[in-house]
Amino acid sequence: MVIRSEIVSIGDELLKGQRVNTNASFIASALSDIGIPVVRVVACGDAEEEIMSALRESLERADIVLVTGGLGPTRDDRTLKAAAGLLQRDLKLSPAAFDALQEWFVSRGRKMPEAMRDQARIIEGSLLVPNTTGTAAGMIADAGERFMNHTLVLMPGVPSEMKAMMNQTVIPYFATSSKMVIRHTPVRTLGIGETLLAELVVEVEDHMPEGTTLAYLPHTAGVDLMVSTIGSSVEAVERDNRGVVDALLARTGRYVYATEDVTIEETVGRLLAQRGMTIAVAESCTGGLLASRLTDIAGSSRYFLEGVVVYSNKAKEHFLGVKFETLQLYGAVSPEVAAEMAEGCLFVSGADIAVSTTGIAGPSNESEDKPVGMLCLGVARKEPGGEVSVSTRTLFYHGTREQNKLRFSQAALCEVWESLQDR
């Protein structure tokens, strides 16, 4: 039987949009890795009655309820009192938690305020979850027959404290009780939208084995597919997961750059290093973002030679040798200029491959035939015979300036990746 869990995130700041709920994301991922799916995430305010209501509903539905927030020493921290009231149990001082709390203050050369004693209180009969990075004790409690002996976990809302508790105590505790095996495999794509991707893989989705799900994870730079398989047998889970991934690759292979958690810049870097090739970039509309992404990868000095940002027409002429006539005739945002930028970059740098970007990121400077979101890419590379080949591509995007710049850089990396496929 699959163990089902829910997350309850407590804090008015979450409901007001003053904080992003990163805790829930971390907990869900950690539980998924040990075969415990999260079926619901609930957020509620700091009022005691709201907390009790949220905990009651979650404990009635889920085998495990994990709670973050509301365990601190201030007046708006009401989670512990609400949970104890719901379970109809007293709060007891934990000697181990109290000793750790005193040590926390001593190690910082401070005297512990008497009011901080409450940070060492836990629900009667619960298991202490030590806080090795803060003051508030966590706990794992059996909710009793009233809630079908479901389990309640209380942790602070401070991300660093919650993560330490999860890694050191909570995950090891539940890993022994979960008999399920889970396997996640990302299928990372580029150059294709979510709708078209869904059309390509609809047959795969319709015939997936029991226990396997497919999630679409669109983001600014592309669309990822996540194949998740859960079951009781390691061999069966691996077989079913691999089978679905292979079926997806058979239909989307030309758009897939990885089936592991790596970025396109990492993939391009690996290909360049494997082939003993070097790269240089000439950027206008991306303003150095492309070079930044390539050099974010450790070891990129093996293949990245240089990058130049040529924003003005004069800079394009001066640094890359783009012809004045080409700029006048076609304009800076054109396939012709992109080609000359890439070829000039290849010549100046001595790299094996060079990529150029010129476009209109927005929100202004568009014209009737050159709208915001227009991108012209150029790729120049040295061929085995010594000659130079140059290719261009024109693409159109819709988004904010920041989104367009990211998509432009992603498209440039995609172009390089495609260019390396036949090497």
Curated annotation (Swiss-Prot):
InterPro entries (alphabetical): CinA, CinA-like_C, CinA_C, CinA_KH, Competence-induced_CinA, MoaB/Mog-like_dom_sf, MoaB/Mog_dom
Gene3D superfamilies on file: CinA-like, MoaB/Mog-like domain
HAMAP family, alphabetized: CinA_B
Entry similarity comment: Belongs to the CinA family.
The protein's name: CinA-like protein
Organism field: Chlorobium phaeobacteroides (strain DSM 266 / SMG 266 / 2430)
Phylogenetic lineage: Bacteria, Pseudomonadati, Chlorobiota, Chlorobiia, Chlorobiales
